[in-house]
């Protein structure tokens, strides 16, 4: 089950109370104070783990709390610290305040550990309150309460390449033949109901991650179809690959324009992202010479449109996932784009 958003209350542990205690030994009838301190409450810590892929472990849970600190004891024994609660989440998880929508944490790297809520401090035992005018203090501090916060955990997949296209255009077939992902494939719309990640090995030394996002339909940015719920996942991809289907009644140019408009409505930043275009099912030209000519005209119209909008950054390639033609060229094209983006990112962060 793919769970990508959960609402939950998180609370760190309360500090244990300090002890009120006095020495009780033979021949010492009025022993001084020996109350120990309370233990600190446990912390809430987020841990990013790429072996975890969804937020399903949080499903159905309304509240998670770290352990409270133990109370102090006599003979100056301090209470034990409460156990921390470590929450394991997949890469791409954001922790968002439900009331303000502020992003509190953004977990993007394997092994990343972030302290989220600090446990309450334990109270001081009565030993600390002995002074010249009060040799036998009969009070100690209570522990400080832990922190509590209502948050929403949201998972946005992190990938190098995000596949963008209408339902049933060949995205799942593509990712199944170029990567280790095994999505469900069938000849009907919305086969892909959840995002899928696949590792694409280009050669012995180079690879990248590709994301198959459920198909977008016109109006997805307004909530139609399955697209809106998963458009956010495309935000975490570095490069977009539009997958267009020559077998659809809608011309290739129109497919591209509609898809781009949906991205623009959802996010201006996403609209301006670098992209490539893949014409899928190139083996369909075998359906006849007339059909092949129509596809060629369609592609030419799209190519001219790309020149009109002055977008020299994009590439256009024909691929058949079934016959495995054009796949090698596509992988190397994508790798070059990703390398450029990675290098630019390094330059920006120096």
From Swiss-Prot:
Its EC number is 3.6.5.-. GTP binds at residues 165-172, 190-194, 212-215, 280-283, 320-322. Its cofactor is Mg(2+). Residues 1-158 form the Obg domain. One of its GO terms (molecular function) is magnesium ion binding. An essential GTPase which binds GTP, GDP and possibly (p)ppGpp with moderate affinity, with high nucleotide exchange rates and a fairly low GTP hydrolysis rate. Plays a role in control of the cell cycle, stress response, ribosome biogenesis and in those bacteria that undergo differentiation, in morphogenesis control. Mg(2+) binds at residues 172, 192. This is GTPase Obg. Monomer. Pfam families: GTP1_OBG, MMR_HSR1. Belongs to the TRAFAC class OBG-HflX-like GTPase superfamily. OBG GTPase family. It comes from Campylobacter jejuni (strain RM1221).
């Amino acid at each position: 089950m793919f769970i990508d958003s959960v609402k939950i209350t998180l609370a760190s542990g309360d500090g244990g109370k300090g002890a009120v205690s006095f020495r009780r030994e033979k021949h010492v009838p009025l022993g001084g104070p020996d109350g120990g301190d309370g233990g600190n409450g446990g912390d809430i810590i987020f841990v990013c783990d790429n072996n975890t892929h969804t937020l399903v472990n949080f499903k159905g849970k309304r509240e998670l709390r770290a352990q409270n600190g133990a109370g102090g004891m006599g003979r100056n024994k301090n209470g034990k610290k409460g156990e921390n609660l470590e929450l394991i989440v997949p890469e791409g998880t954001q922790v968002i305040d439900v009331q303000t929508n502020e992003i509190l944490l953004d977990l993007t790297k394997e092994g990343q550990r972030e302290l989220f809520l600090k446990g309450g401090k334990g109270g001081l035992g009565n030993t600390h309150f002995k002074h010249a005018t009060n040799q036998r203090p009969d009070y100690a501090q209570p522990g400080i309460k832990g922190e509590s916060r209502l948050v929403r955990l949201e998972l946005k997949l992190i990938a190098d390449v995000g596949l963008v296209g209408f339902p049933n255009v060949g995205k799942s077939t593509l990712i199944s033949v170029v990567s280790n992902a095994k999505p469900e494939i069938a000849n009907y719309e919305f086969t892909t109901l959840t995002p899928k990640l696949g590792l694409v090995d280009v050669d012995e030394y180079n690879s990248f991650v590709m994301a198959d996002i459920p198909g977008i339909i016109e109006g997805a940015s307004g909530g139609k179809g399955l697209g809106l719920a998963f458009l956010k996942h495309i935000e975490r991809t570095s490069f977009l690959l539009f997958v267009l289907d020559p077998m659809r009644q809608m011309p290739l140019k129109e497919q591209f324009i509609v898809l781009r408009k949906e991205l623009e409505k959802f996010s201006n930043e996403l609209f301006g992202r670098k992209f490539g275009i893949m014409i899928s099912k190139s083996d369909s030209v075998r359906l006849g010479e007339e059909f092949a000519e129509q596809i060629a005209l369609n592609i030419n119209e799209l190519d001219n449109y790309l020149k009109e909008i002055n977008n020299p950054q994009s590439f256009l390639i024909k691929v058949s996932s079934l016959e495995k033609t054009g796949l090698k060229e596509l992988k190397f094209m994508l790798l070059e784009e990703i390398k450029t983006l990675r290098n630019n990112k390094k330059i920006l962060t120096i």
